[in-house]
Design a protein with these regions (language model features):
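Phosphate-binding/switch region of NTP-binding enzymes
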Residues: 196-325
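Intrinsically disordered, low-complexity domain-flanking/linker segments in eukaryotic proteins
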Residues: 56-60, 91-120, 232-259
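Preference for well-ordered, secondary-structure-rich cores of eukaryotic proteins
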Residues: 5-13, 35, 140, 147-156, ...
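The Walker A/P-loop phosphate-binding site
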Residues: 1-103, 110-116
């Protein structure tokens, strides 16, 4: 019963995922062109999850749970995670107070220097052990990983004494174009049985759905988008064409003032229907030279599902992602 109550409780995530209440079992798609800080958003959420709530009298405000990170585009840099974690530990150790996940008077500053304060290496090692990483090089490895993930998570739970709260999939569409170009994928070299693009997507969704029944987690999946025209700086509102079950590649339109941006939804309908929440992130068209964040790229986030009538601007620093408007 306690596990069921925990699964139903909302998770208070960090920006830009803070606008919508999320629960274990939700599937959040973080879509956007490259670069748009999608992986940085995952890293910040991962640090929040693996940090303890409290350690030796210091409040860190974390969840103290495991993160399962599946890297599909094979470009994840573990050093970025460790540096972000170290920065958070030093920042908190220096303040001695509760971590402020929201805006401070000037949390962004103008440089990239880290606080001149040490951090607890024992705590750092404990947090890093709660980050579970798997790299897949093709759809076959991805499917094999999903089919065995239930047992991996069970062993991890027995080892660490805590459950996994986040299942992160970096670049869910990484193998889409390769699989689409191939007529089929062999399950075994001596087998006639083949996997089609549609069956791959169906199996992925089915395996994740079965996994969530046994190990309730919040799924955070990034996805690269194919964009058309540029946005305007005005508030972004989304309209979309009716999904066609016969054509998995649906043209979506995002409007901003008089300008429109089209992007193609290339993922199969079975995945689109599986997603419960979707947020679009992109580089803002602000001129950095005219802002106080001259050394930082400014990004824009917009919730498409559920649709919200406003958007957030944010920047990425060593300490994480911060909303600037």
């Amino acid at each position: 019963m306690l596990s069921r109550v925990s699964a139903e409780r909302s998770l208070m995530l960090l920006p830009p995922l803070h606008r919508v209440p999320l629960r274990l079992g939700n599937v959040v798609e973080i879509a956007g062109p490259s670069p748009s800080a999608k992986t940085q958003i995952l890293i910040q959420a991962a640090v929040y999850c693996i940090l303890p709530k409290e350690w030796r009298g210091v409040h860190y405000g974390g969840l103290e749970h495991l993160v399962m990170f599946i890297d599909l585009d094979c470009r994840f840099d573990i050093l970025c995670l460790s540096q972000s974690l170290k920065h958070r530990l030093m920042e908190t150790s220096g303040s001695g107070n509760k971590v402020n996940w929201e805006q401070n008077d000037d949390p962004w500053g103008s440089g990239t220097e880290e606080p001149n304060i040490g951090y607890d290496e024992e705590l750092f090692a404990a947090c890093m052990r709660r980050f579970l990483y798997i790299r897949c090089y093709d759809s076959f490895e991805f499917l094999a990983t999903l089919k065995t993930l239930r047992y991996r998570l069970q062993r991890a739970r027995e080892t660490h004494g805590v459950t996994a709260h986040f299942l992160m999939i970096d670049s869910i569409g990484a193998f889409y174009w390769v699989d689409r170009a191939s007529t089929s994928l062999h399950l075994e070299s001596n087998s006639r049985k083949r996997l089609s693009l549609q069956s791959i997507s169906e199996t992925v969704v089915e395996e994740i759905r079965k996994l969530l029944l046994v190990h309730p987690m919040l799924v955070l999946a990034t996805k690269a988008t194919i964009l058309g025209d540029t946005y305007s700086t005005n508030e972004v509102k989304r309209t979309s064409m009716k999904l066609s079950s016969n054509d998995p590649s649906n043209l979506r339109t995002v409007t901003g003032g008089p300008q429109k941006l089209s992007y193609r939804e290339f993922m199969p309908l079975v995945w689109q229907s599986f997603v419960t929440h979707r947020i679009l992130v992109r580089a803002a068209d602000d001129d950095p030279a005219n802002s106080k964040y001259q050394s930082r790229s400014i990004f824009l986030s917009e919730w498409l599902m559920p649709s919200l009538n406003f958007s957030d601007k944010f920047i990425v620093r060593d300490a994480g992602v911060f909303v600037v408007s």
